[in-house]
């Protein structure tokens, strides 16, 4: 069976894969393979200062060890900078973006919502971030797990950064351009990115790009409430007995794997997942405590 479905897993090489990463990878992989779709891997290496040496290689080796097979070559955002620059120039020329010289200290009292200080200031681009003007509109979409999501861009976000002051490109711009370039039809990722999606919908609309379907899976959190992640030194996935964490990941996604699946191979665990995948079983919640799995 084949389909037009194109999914992707897009890790950031600021550390190694951990259990939270695995849950997102399993969800995106099974959602694609269950319908005969393609599954791509993309390195989101936008921020060289934060990249851990050797992490890209380690991530790919872990995916292979855990039985994942991707289609085509691994793409890297660091090779796409000219495409991002071209779109930023286009947005600046059309007046849809502008230079912003605000410091973090100037903005610290605004709870992450940009107040528009530089919107009409006409600053030069030197030593400035680039922000995208947002409309006073509410954006809605229906997530396949989390249901309807609404966000008023003007009131809840404000004009947002698409290129940082240090010249590095922002995630919101890069992810939209790369998903369109790769023909991604379905985005399956962690629920921490749920509130980024309306910004991405706006960019897609602005640039005339097609809108993919979205599915946001619960984040795995530690007892203190922090999500599993590189910032909190979550342990990397074990090199051996990959079927054990794979089976736990299936349970985190609401699937019902037999206990003996953990005693087999990684390939067997993923094959079971593909054959029995049911996205409607994924818990409709933003987080899941790791100790409950």
Swiss-Prot record:
The keyword ATP-binding applies. Keywords: Aminoacyl-tRNA synthetase, ATP-binding, Ligase, Metal-binding, Nucleotide-binding, Zinc. InterPro entries: Glu-Q_tRNA(Asp)_Synthase, Glu/Gln-tRNA-synth, Glu/Gln-tRNA-synth_Ib_cat-dom, GluQ/Sye, Rossmann-like_a/b/a_fold. A motif ('KMSKS' region) lies at residues 227-231. Its cofactor is Zn(2+). Zn(2+) binds at residues 100, 102, 114, 118. It comes from the Bacteria. L-glutamate binds at residues 8-12, 44, 171, 189. Pfam families: tRNA-synt_1c (PF00749). The keyword Flavoprotein does not apply. GO terms for molecular function: ATP binding; glutamate-tRNA ligase activity; zinc ion binding. Its EC number is 6.1.1.-. One of its GO terms (biological process) is tRNA modification. ATP binds at residue 230. GO terms for cellular component: cytosol. A motif ('HIGH' region) lies at residues 11-21. Binds 1 zinc ion per subunit. It is an enzyme of class 6 (ligase). HAMAP family: Glu_Q_tRNA_synth. Belongs to the class-I aminoacyl-tRNA synthetase family. GluQ subfamily. PANTHER family: GLUTAMATE--TRNA LIGASE, GLUTAMYL-Q TRNA(ASP) SYNTHETASE. Catalyzes the tRNA-independent activation of glutamate in presence of ATP and the subsequent transfer of glutamate onto a tRNA(Asp). Glutamate is transferred on the 2-amino-5-(4,5-dihydroxy-2-cyclopenten-1-yl) moiety of the queuosine in the wobble position of the QUC anticodon. This is Glutamyl-Q tRNA(Asp) synthetase. It comes from Pseudomonas paraeruginosa (strain DSM 24068 / PA7) (Pseudomonas aeruginosa (strain PA7)).
């Amino acid at each position: 069976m084949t389909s037009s479905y194109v999914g992707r897993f897009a890790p950031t090489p600021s550390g190694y894969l951990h259990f939270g990463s695995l849950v997102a990878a399993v969800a995106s992989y099974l959602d694609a393979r269950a319908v005969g779709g393609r599954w791509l891997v993309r390195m989101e290496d936008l921020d060289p200062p934060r990249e851990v040496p050797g992490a890209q290689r380690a991530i790919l080796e872990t995916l292979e060890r855990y039985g994942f097979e991707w289609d085509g070559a691994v793409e890297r955002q660091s090779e796409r900078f000219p495409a991002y620059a071209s779109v930023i120039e286009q947005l600046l020329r059309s007046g849809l973006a502008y230079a912003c010289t605000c410091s973090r200290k100037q903005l610290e009292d605004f709870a992450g919502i940009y107040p528009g200080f530089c919107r009409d200031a006409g600053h030069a681009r030197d030593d400035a971030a680039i922000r995208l003007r947002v409309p006073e509109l509410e954006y809605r979409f229906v997530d396949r797990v989390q249901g309807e999501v609404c966000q008023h861009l003007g009131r809840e976000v404000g004009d947002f950064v698409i290129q940082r002051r240090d010249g590095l490109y922002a995630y919101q711009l890069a992810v939209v351009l790369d998903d369109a370039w790769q023909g991604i039809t379905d985005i399956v990722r962690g629920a921490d990115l749920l509130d980024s999606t309306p910004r991405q919908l706006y960019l897609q609309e602005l640039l005339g790009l097609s809108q993919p379907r979205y599915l946001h899976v619960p984040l795995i959190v530690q007892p203190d409430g922090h999500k599993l992640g590189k910032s909190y030194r979550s342990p990397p996935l074990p090199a051996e007995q990959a079927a054990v964490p794979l089976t736990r990941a299936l349970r985190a996604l609401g699937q019902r794997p037999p206990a003996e699946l953990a005693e087999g191979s990684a390939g067997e665990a993923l094959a079971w997942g593909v054959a029995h995948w049911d996205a409607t079983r994924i818990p409709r919640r933003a987080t899941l405590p790791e100790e409950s799995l």
